[in-house]
Amino acid sequence: MTLRFSILALLGAAFALLAGPALARCSQNLVQFGAGVQVASLEGFHFAADLSPNRVIVTFVGHSSFQIDTPQGVRAITDYNGVNGFGRKPDIVTMNNAHSTHFTDDPEEGITYVLNGWPSKPGETEAKHDVTLKDMKVWNVPTNARDWGGNSARINGNSIFIYAIADLCIAHLGHLHHRLTKEHLDELGRIDVLMVPIDGAYTMGMPLMVDVIKQIQPKVVLPMHYWGRGQLDRFEGLMAALDADFIWPDRRSVEIVKEQLPEKLTVIAVGGEGGG
């Protein structure tokens, strides 16, 4: 079963201007918020039976892995560690290598694109990807990562992966260890849905991660990389300062349509209380 949500309120001309070719890179945000996020009622936010041909289905697989299914049947898995999610194998997998739970050295044969988020070839200083398969375009923005063997940084050791589908821009922060620069934000462009690690330790402190959310200004946040209700409760408390709504669905999947994005910043805990 898939959790389907629909927003009755129209987003207005500003969001109409954001529309572009489905496979184009995400344009910059045209709506800028001040401190926090503009207040908008979620009255009318409900789970509906109507389907859109532009729906994108995002399913929480576990830990930092999400399965993304496009209208044309392309399937991607984020932070792929060898677990194929639900059903058939993916067409595209993206990986980061902060820990073994975020990648595999032995991906299943037949995956069309296997994209590492770190330099993995001799002489390579950063991973750079830009691939398109049917209605999904995927590229990455390299960021630094801590060297767990010491106090130094692994330059370009992590990647934020962006998935452009059906005029939606979805970003997965990977194992992010620092705030973003203007250059990072320019490369990211407009992000509608943001997958965010909220462990508060292995990646970065939770207040700092909330700062990153403020930098990116998504419409929807999907928490990941947490273990138990306590971390979610703390994250919910911090996000309250941004006047965000918090939704606890009873399923692992959410159906997202660009034209039905909420006006107000919304956190959807598709990983449930356990996360993983």
Kindly give the residue locations of the regions a language model identified.
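Positively charged n-region of N-terminal signal peptides that target proteins for export
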Residues: M1-F5
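Bacterial N-terminal signal peptides
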Residues: L8-L18
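Metallo-beta-lactamase
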Residues: A19-R146, L168-L173, D192-V196, R229, ...
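Short, structured coil segments at secondary-structure junctions
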Residues: K89, I216-Q217
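Active-site-proximal loop/helix segments of hydrolase catalytic cores
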Residues: A145-I216, W227-R234, L238
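A Lys-centered signature of the CheY-like receiver
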Residues: M224
